Protein backbone atom coordinates (compact mmCIF):
# COMPACT_ATOMS: atom_id res chain seq x y z
CA UNK A 1 0.00 0.00 0.00
CA UNK A 2 1.29 3.43 -0.94
CA UNK A 3 -0.21 6.76 -0.01
CA UNK A 4 0.55 10.44 -0.02
CA UNK A 5 0.40 13.07 2.70
CA UNK A 6 1.34 16.73 2.85
CA UNK A 7 0.42 20.24 3.88
CA UNK A 8 0.97 23.87 2.95
CA UNK A 9 2.22 26.76 5.07
CA UNK A 10 3.15 30.41 4.46
CA UNK A 11 6.57 31.39 5.80
CA UNK A 12 7.44 35.00 6.56
CA UNK A 13 10.69 34.94 4.58
CA UNK A 14 11.63 35.57 0.92
CA UNK A 15 11.46 32.57 -1.40
CA UNK A 16 15.25 32.47 -1.99
CA UNK A 17 15.91 32.25 1.76
CA UNK A 18 13.30 29.52 2.28
CA UNK A 19 14.59 27.52 -0.68
CA UNK A 20 18.20 27.71 0.57
CA UNK A 21 17.13 26.49 4.03
CA UNK A 22 15.09 23.57 2.69
CA UNK A 23 17.70 22.65 0.06
CA UNK A 24 20.20 21.97 2.85
CA UNK A 25 19.02 18.60 4.12
CA UNK A 26 21.25 19.01 7.17
CA UNK A 27 18.61 21.48 8.44
CA UNK A 28 16.02 18.67 8.71
CA UNK A 29 16.57 18.04 12.46
CA UNK A 30 15.60 21.68 13.10
CA UNK A 31 11.99 20.87 12.12
CA UNK A 32 11.72 17.07 12.21
CA UNK A 33 12.10 15.47 15.63
CA UNK A 34 12.29 12.01 14.02
CA UNK A 35 15.63 12.92 12.35
CA UNK A 36 18.31 12.15 14.92
CA UNK A 37 21.26 12.87 12.63
CA UNK A 38 21.83 13.60 8.95
CA UNK A 39 24.85 14.26 6.75
CA UNK A 40 25.40 15.05 3.09
CA UNK A 41 27.25 12.17 1.42
CA UNK A 42 28.18 13.87 -1.86
CA UNK A 43 30.53 16.74 -2.65
CA UNK A 44 29.47 20.19 -3.76
CA UNK A 45 26.37 22.25 -3.12
CA UNK A 46 22.95 20.58 -2.99
CA UNK A 47 21.47 19.74 -6.38
CA UNK A 48 20.22 16.85 -8.48
CA UNK A 49 22.12 13.73 -7.38
CA UNK A 50 22.97 14.96 -3.88
CA UNK A 51 22.59 12.16 -1.32
CA UNK A 52 21.82 12.58 2.38
CA UNK A 53 22.19 9.75 4.93
CA UNK A 54 20.25 9.94 8.17
CA UNK A 55 19.30 8.08 11.30
CA UNK A 56 15.62 8.45 12.16
CA UNK A 57 13.41 7.21 14.96
CA UNK A 58 9.88 6.09 14.13
CA UNK A 59 7.60 4.24 16.54
CA UNK A 60 10.55 3.74 18.88
CA UNK A 61 12.75 2.11 16.22
CA UNK A 62 15.93 3.66 14.82
CA UNK A 63 16.62 3.12 11.13
CA UNK A 64 19.21 4.32 8.63
CA UNK A 65 17.85 6.20 5.62
CA UNK A 66 19.35 7.55 2.41
CA UNK A 67 17.67 10.08 0.14
CA UNK A 68 18.73 11.39 -3.26
CA UNK A 69 17.65 14.75 -4.68
CA UNK A 70 15.95 14.04 -8.02
CA UNK A 71 14.74 17.51 -9.04
CA UNK A 72 16.17 20.87 -8.02
CA UNK A 73 14.66 24.01 -9.57
CA UNK A 74 15.86 27.15 -7.76
CA UNK A 75 13.85 28.68 -6.09
CA UNK A 76 10.60 26.77 -6.59
CA UNK A 77 10.94 22.97 -6.51
CA UNK A 78 12.85 20.22 -4.68
CA UNK A 79 12.14 16.51 -5.11
CA UNK A 80 13.77 13.50 -3.48
CA UNK A 81 13.54 9.73 -3.47
CA UNK A 82 14.50 7.36 -0.68
CA UNK A 83 17.16 4.97 -1.95
CA UNK A 84 17.53 2.93 1.24
CA UNK A 85 15.65 -0.30 1.81
CA UNK A 86 13.38 -0.29 4.85
CA UNK A 87 9.99 -1.74 5.74
CA UNK A 88 8.32 1.60 4.96
CA UNK A 89 10.01 4.04 2.59
CA UNK A 90 9.33 7.38 0.94
CA UNK A 91 9.90 6.72 -2.77
CA UNK A 92 8.94 10.31 -3.54
CA UNK A 93 8.73 13.56 -1.63
CA UNK A 94 9.20 17.22 -2.22
CA UNK A 95 8.69 20.90 -1.64
CA UNK A 96 6.93 23.36 -3.94
CA UNK A 97 7.61 27.03 -3.17
CA UNK A 98 5.83 30.12 -4.48
CA UNK A 99 5.89 33.80 -3.54
CA UNK A 100 3.06 34.77 -1.17
CA UNK A 101 3.06 38.52 -0.59
CA UNK A 102 6.27 39.28 1.30
CA UNK A 103 6.62 35.61 2.27
CA UNK A 104 6.70 32.17 0.69
CA UNK A 105 4.08 29.47 0.35
CA UNK A 106 5.60 26.02 0.90
CA UNK A 107 3.71 22.85 0.04
CA UNK A 108 5.41 19.63 1.09
CA UNK A 109 4.49 16.03 0.41
CA UNK A 110 5.78 12.51 0.89
CA UNK A 111 4.59 9.23 -0.55
CA UNK A 112 4.91 6.29 1.85
CA UNK A 113 5.14 2.71 0.64
CA UNK A 114 5.37 -0.56 2.56
CA UNK A 115 7.64 -3.42 1.51
CA UNK A 116 7.29 -7.05 2.59
CA UNK A 117 6.05 -7.08 6.19
CA UNK A 118 6.12 -3.26 6.05
CA UNK A 119 3.00 -3.40 3.90
CA UNK A 120 1.14 -4.35 7.08
CA UNK A 121 2.22 -1.18 8.91
CA UNK A 122 2.36 1.29 6.01
CA UNK A 123 -1.31 2.22 6.45
CA UNK A 124 -0.76 3.00 10.12
CA UNK A 125 2.34 5.07 9.29
CA UNK A 126 0.41 6.94 6.61
CA UNK A 127 -2.52 7.73 8.93
CA UNK A 128 -0.11 9.02 11.56
CA UNK A 129 1.77 11.13 9.00
CA UNK A 130 -1.47 12.61 7.63
CA UNK A 131 -2.61 13.46 11.16
CA UNK A 132 0.69 15.25 11.87
CA UNK A 133 1.13 16.96 8.48
CA UNK A 134 -0.17 20.39 9.51
CA UNK A 135 1.98 20.39 12.67
CA UNK A 136 4.99 19.37 10.56
CA UNK A 137 4.34 22.30 8.20
CA UNK A 138 4.19 24.64 11.21
CA UNK A 139 7.51 23.20 12.45
CA UNK A 140 9.09 23.99 9.06
CA UNK A 141 7.74 27.55 9.31
CA UNK A 142 9.11 28.01 12.83
CA UNK A 143 12.54 26.63 11.90
CA UNK A 144 12.93 28.78 8.79
CA UNK A 145 11.73 31.93 10.55
CA UNK A 146 14.15 31.28 13.44
CA UNK A 147 17.15 30.81 11.14
Regions flagged by a language model, labelled:
Residues 9, 54-56, 80, 95, ...:
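Preference for bulky hydrophobic residues occupying beta-strand positions
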Residues 7-9, 65-71, 82, 91-99:
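Hydrophobic/aromatic beta-strand elements that line small-molecule binding cavities or substrate pockets
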Residues 39-86, 105, 135-147:
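Glycine-rich portal/gate segments that line the openings of hydrophobic small-molecule binding cavities
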Residues 83-135:
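Beta-strand/loop substructures that line and gate deep hydrophobic ligand-binding cavities in soluble
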Residues 1-43, 47:
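Hydrophobic ligand-binding cavity/cleft-lining segments
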Residues 2, 62, 88-90:
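Short solvent-exposed loop/turn micro-motifs enriched in small/polar/acidic residues
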Amino acid sequence: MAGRFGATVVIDRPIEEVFAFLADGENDPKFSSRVLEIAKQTDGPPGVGTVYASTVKDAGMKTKREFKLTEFEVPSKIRWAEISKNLVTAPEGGYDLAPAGDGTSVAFFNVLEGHGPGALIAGLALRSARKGADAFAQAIKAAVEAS
